[in-house]
Amino acid sequence: MMFKLGVLLTICLLLFPLTGTALDGDQLAEHMLDISSGINDRWFDPVRKCCMRPVCTCPCCS
């Protein structure tokens, strides 16, 4: 009985892998919002695409 359940579980995981599940519909939009949120910052320099703060630890400013 346990062998049959193990075989069934293996077949199900092969047919429907957990990493193959679709993302939420709004997940990409939220990610793009996080990326573009720095554009509205008053310290943001659009030419350098980085902040102009006096003490900046961003990798693009160093």
UniProtKB/Swiss-Prot annotation:
Residues 1-22 form the signal peptide. It is found in: Secreted. Residues 23-49 form a propeptide. It comes from the Eukaryota. One of its GO terms (molecular function) is toxin activity. GO terms for cellular component: extracellular region. Disulfide bonds join C50-C60, C51-C58, C56-C61. Its main location: secreted. Keywords: Cleavage on pair of basic residues, Disulfide bond, Secreted, Signal, Toxin. The keyword Signal applies. Expressed by the venom duct. The cysteine framework is III (CC-C-C-CC). Classified in the M-1 branch, since 1 residue stands between the fourth and the fifth cysteine residues. Belongs to the conotoxin M superfamily. This is Conotoxin reg3.5. It comes from Conus regius.
